[in-house]
């Protein structure tokens, strides 16, 4: 039984679109098969994606909130009586005939399956975008038999199991009397024909494994977990149906200096004691190159400075986020005798003695002492 989609994403039913997107990204990153090697990681990833696909679309979400996992089109609507929409009756038919008795026409055209492919990209490529070619493993129509599955020149023959009808009749005694049900022939899979000899290249499947080169245009501003849809590059269709689509899931590599939150970039730079006390003009790395940043005198450690427009471009809009620079004052650990002497002189000029605190900082340390004493 499927779990509630809100429960899967760990959000409440009143969650807004941003909360749902944030929860999805966190869980997708946690369970993605490229990262998580647990046996159930792939299933959990699919469950998370399915929940997000529904809850991120307003129309689908509204329908889910009203009907849950139950298809509102089941039952007596349009297509007449459907045993699967009648609960217990569907179970009774399954009990006597199996779940495959009411399959749709197997010869009808069907869309091919969608494919999912994980692609790792660099941090800076999310900022500026990228065009690239990737090779995708997929199934394609067999060139030997042109998708028929039969060995060239051998042809097909009428299925002996169903006499070419594509269906089998199965009778069973039930509490309602003797019931005869039709189901898809298991020998020919409803086609009514079987191969005299299977194609040796595809072993009768009509498909072979290939690697197809796909051109991707990664837009600037994408984030980790984003999906690019490439229409028609999924598995080939069945019985002349259209091919499925390809979904490329982007995995952004971590950067040794930059971190990203939304469209803003964060980094940390060191300052010497003299730079923090006296002020300075330093160079700060950005994704666009180095820029000048003025540090005012008396700057404290962990102070943030903003570089406007140096963040990540907005994916659907104009402009870019900002870069936030946190400075950290580095305390020297190896001092020469001369440096120690100068620091002692500075302490004395400030009215302090080495190892003691006074002046404006006294109140801060007194508060710390009282907090430790529980006062």
From Swiss-Prot:
Highest taxon in the source lineage: Bacteria
Keywords on record: Chaperone, Cytoplasm, DNA replication, Metal-binding, Repeat, Stress response, Zinc, Zinc-finger
Stored InterPro entries: DnaJ, DnaJ_C, DnaJ_domain, HSP40/DnaJ_pept-bd, HSP_DnaJ_Cys-rich_dom, HSP_DnaJ_Cys-rich_dom_sf, J_dom_sf
Keyword Cell membrane listed: no
Cofactor binding: number and manner: Binds 2 Zn(2+) ions per monomer.
Single GO molecular function: ATP binding
Zinc finger (CR-type): 129-211
Amino-acid positions noted as binding Zn(2+) 1 in the UniProt annotation, renumbered to this chain: 142, 145, 199, 202
Region spans: Disordered: 349-375
J domain span: 4-68
CXXCXGXG motif repeats, residue ranges: 142-149, 159-166, 185-192, 199-206
HAMAP family according to UniProt: DnaJ
Protein name as annotated: Chaperone protein DnaJ
Biological source species: Brevibacillus choshinensis
High-level lineage: Bacteria, Bacillati, Bacillota, Bacilli, Bacillales
Gene it is expressed from: dnaJ
